[in-house]
Amino acid sequence: SEWDVKNWTMDELKAHVGFMKDFNVQLKSEGVLVGAEGLAPPGQARIVRAGKKDGAPEVTDGPFAESKEFLAGYWIIHVDSPEQAYAIAARASIAPGPGGKPLYIPIEVREVASAPPVEP
């Protein structure tokens, strides 16, 4: 699959990572980047919850094996409109994959939630 980076050549991987680094520099120069990180592969994920008896961490492997989609990274941007966020997401979507061809990555766009006002 074009999404399985284990099958990419080193040059393809370098081109992809280079694209993402350059993209982050562009967002920073545009004054919209709040934060961005790539994440480790899903095989390194762990699911943690508090133990019911003593609250100690209970750690299991995750995510679930049947999951085919996963979060590879994220950006937090500060923009004036949803349309501006969509345009930025479309730019990220064309990151190169195998053979240098655009991947057309599906980018999920969500607003950062605001907490309801708390009365003193």
Regions of interest found by a model, annotated:
Residues 1-120:
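Conserved, structured core segments of small domains
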